[in-house]
């Protein structure tokens, strides 16, 4: 592997780790805010205990996310110096605003954690969760703006290889910003809901602490409902993304579906094997006209093929598999959550909502949704190749030529293993031998009674 490929691998590895914690950073505040809202609204201490436990766990993931996020910022400057020299001043505003959003979130998260039972009106404490949600979401908005700029650059003029006459607001709110941000936020909410649901399902299947059954059933119900509606929004975001790509990045959409010749009634391909020399696909599931329909709501829509673009500008064909895997994981989560919600809607089927096989299905949604996030980011980043800034700078032109990058990659790989292991270990230890019913009892005692003995 040459320096460019190693630099790409290191960046991909860093992003793959960071996106886990970034997703939690956007989704978890929403979940513990909903739990607290339900706890106050229903006067139910089970939900209050959820909010307290989830917020406590969230602090650990925030700490690790700060580390991985800082590393990404450093790697932009150290591994991709030519890119930062050319466009660093253009993306400076969203990078600064992302830092501001993080500190905004951190301040209110601290207040949220240390002011339980400090207010006579319980809704006052709940309101503190809203700035935490805003901070996490805006942090995602601003960092997504940087990535969107790399896909659809705007707000500058290029003179003598330099970006001049910069319009920071136009650059930040570039053409793909709204669609991509919507997709990021909805999928983060979806993923966090399903991760929580899968943990609740796991606890119910093991049933090592019967006194926690009510707690986990309520956590399961809440998170699956949130997951279902978040999945609907994510599917809408995905549909809007396809239409955006058709208009602004047609070569990317064509690569996703191995669509080589411009045509209407373009078919959607699921999986299969491509012979790049003959451009023939074998073994794929073909859905006639669906690619055209995704592009512009009509099977008659003409979709540009890859053969309209120079071969040197074609994204890697492997992106097709990432697209199919992302969609498959999303559909799996949608079907399972949809079936669960249907069992709640009809009284005679409610007993199946906590059936063993339903719980096994829900157990899959956590890993599946997180994998969908990972595949989605591999898809969008590899789909931009060979550009680091589409139409202006190639990846090969932006990478560092400094030696020792292989050694640095190995060091970071070891660091990420240690970080992931430490985070998992601390989270497990945080709740090991500390059943939820004990937290519920402590809350009940403060109100003059005890639920469980």
What are the roles of these predicted feature ranges?
Residues 1-453:
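Polytopic transmembrane helical bundles with strong interfacial aromatic enrichment
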């Amino acid at each position: 592997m040459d320096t460019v490929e190693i630099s790409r691998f290191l960046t991909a590895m860093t992003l793959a780790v960071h996106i886990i914690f970034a997703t939690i950073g956007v989704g978890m505040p929403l979940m513990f805010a909903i739990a607290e809202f339900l706890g106050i609204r229903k006067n139910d201490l089970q939900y209050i205990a959820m909010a307290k436990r989830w917020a406590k766990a969230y602090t650990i993931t925030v700490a690790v996310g700060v580390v991985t996020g800082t590393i990404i910022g450093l790697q932009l400057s150290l591994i991709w110096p030519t890119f930062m020299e050319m466009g660093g001043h253009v993306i400076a505003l969203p990078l600064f605003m992302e830092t501001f959003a993080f500190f905004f979130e951190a301040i209110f998260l601290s207040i949220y954690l240390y002011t339980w039972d400090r207010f006579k009106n319980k809704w006052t404490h709940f309101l503190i969760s809203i700035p935490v949600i805003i901070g996490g979401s805006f942090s995602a908005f601003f960092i997504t703006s940087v990535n969107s700029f790399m896909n659809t650059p705007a707000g500058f003029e290029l003179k003598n290889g330099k970006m001049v006459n910069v319009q920071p607001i136009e650059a930040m709110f570039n053409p793909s910003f709204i669609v991509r941000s919507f997709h990021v936020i909805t999928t983060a909410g979806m993923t966090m809901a399903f991760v929580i649901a899968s943990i609740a399902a796991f606890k119910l299947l093991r049933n090592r602490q019967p006194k926690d059954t009510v707690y986990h059933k309520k956590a399961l119900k809440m998170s699956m409902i949130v997951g279902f509606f978040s999945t609907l929004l994510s599917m809408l975001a995905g549909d809007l993304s396809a239409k955006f790509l058709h208009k602004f990045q047609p070569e990317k959409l064509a690569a996703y579906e191995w669509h080589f010749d411009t045509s209407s009634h373009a078919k959607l391909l699921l999986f299969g094997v491509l012979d790049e020399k003959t451009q023939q696909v074998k073994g794929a599931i073909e859905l006639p006209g669906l690619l055209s329909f995704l592009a512009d709501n009509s099977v008659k829509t003409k979709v540009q093929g890859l053969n309209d673009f120079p071969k040197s500008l074609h994204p890697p064909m492997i992106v097709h598999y990432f697209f199919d895997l992302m969609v498959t994981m999303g559909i799996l989560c949608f079907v399972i959550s949809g079936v669960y919600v249907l069992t709640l809607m009809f009284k005679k089927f409610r007993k199946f909502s906590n059936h063993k096989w339903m719980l096994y299905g829900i157990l899959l949604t956590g890993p599946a949704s997180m994998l969908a996030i990972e595949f989605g980011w591999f898809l969008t980043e590899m789909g931009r190749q060979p550009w680091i800034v589409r139409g202006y700078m190639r990846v090969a032109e932006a990478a560092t030529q400094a030696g020792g990058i292989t050694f640095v990659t190995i060091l970071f790989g070891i660091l990420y293993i240690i970080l992931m292991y430490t985070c998992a270990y601390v989270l497990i230890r945080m709740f090991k031998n500390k059943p939820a019913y004990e937290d519920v009892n402590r809350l009940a005692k403060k109100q003059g009674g005890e639920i469980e003995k």
